[in-house]
Swiss-Prot record:
Positions of glycan attachment: 68, 72, 76, 84, 88
Disulfide bonds listed in the record: none
Protein name, UniProt field: Chondroitin proteoglycan 7
Chain segments carrying region Disordered: 29-102
Origin superkingdom: Eukaryota
Keywords per UniProt: Glycoprotein, Proteoglycan, Signal
Native species: Caenorhabditis elegans
Compositional bias annotation for Low complexity: 32-41, 48-58
Secretion signal span: 1-19
Length: 116
């Protein structure tokens, strides 16, 4: 009887702890890439969209990153970073990496807009 009680107490404590481990579940990231066109996506996981010419829109509860060569984009969610060919963006967490490993530097959105 005591063994059953102890196992029941352990189960009551362990189940809520393991239910909070989201990183153990399969991730549902969405990655979309195209040469020309537009795309739209929404969900609760990170969304990354890239296009050469066109526009895109994403919305969700997690972070959204959007970049385009010539076009426009809109995003809404908890964390949104938007940039276009003209160099506009509204985020202070942008990271830009170059091809040469010696010149890798993290830029804010304002520094990125000036450098473009």
């Amino acid at each position: 009887m005591q063994t059953i009680t102890i196992l029941a107490l352990i189960a009551c404590v362990a189940v809520p702890i393991f239910a909070d481990f989201d990183h153990l579940r399969a991730r549902r990231d969405v990655v979309e890439s195209s040469g020309e066109g537009s795309g739209e996506s929404s969900g609760e996981k990170p969304v990354v969209e890239s296009s050469g010419e066109g526009s895109g829109e994403s919305s969700g509860d997690k972070e959204a990153v959007e970049a385009s060569g010539e076009g426009s984009g809109e995003g809404s969610g908890d964390a949104t970073l938007e940039s276009s060919g003209e160099g506009s963006g509204e985020s202070h967490n942008a990271v830009v990496a170059s091809d040469s490993p010696k010149d890798v530097k993290a830029l804010t959105a304002n520094e990125f807009a000036v450098s473009v």
